[in-house]
Amino acid sequence: KFLMVADVGIDQIKVYRFDKNEGRISHVDTIRSERESGPRHFLFSKDGKFFYVVHELKNVIDVYSYQSGDKVPVVEKVQTIPTTGDDPDLLTAACAMRFDPNEEHMFCSNAGDNTVSMYERDTETGLLNLKFCLPISGNYPKDIAIFPDGEHLASLNHLSGSISFFRVDYERGLIVMSGRTLRVNEPNCCEIVKL
């Protein structure tokens, strides 16, 4: 019923009603982010009850509850959590967010300090709990991809022209390099699918 668009330049998420019969959209709501936070993009949980917005300038993730209303969706911010560790680089920018296949964990990449953060996700409340923020052996991780097995992660390092691979150790709360680094000219985006 609805289409949402993150507008990083004006710190807003625009909500549009989609009329599939007429092929039209109409603006019905605006979700305002904190000023100069830079909402980059967002993810919905598979059950449609929550969505997550990563802010590249403030280095936070906002968690919202979501209900599809008749005319306007009902959204409520339930959490704001940092994407970096305790001592982030001043030039850090939160970049990408991905769920593991069962949505019990979320990952976020941070350019500048060149890290990946992992969160435990409560599937009932949607809330996140930061488990680690670790370096990724590359420069400017513009995107990350989680393998279908949920046990491996790829970091697309835009400025160093590389893709680094890691095994995720959920119990110990860390990632370990796994396999050789691939050289790729300025990688931007990746989606790994099971065939």
Located regions from the model:
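Conserved beta-strand positions in repeat-built beta-propeller and related beta-rich domains
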Residues: V5-V8, S45, V53-E56, C108-A111, ...
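C-terminal hydrophobic structural anchor segments
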Residues: S117-R167
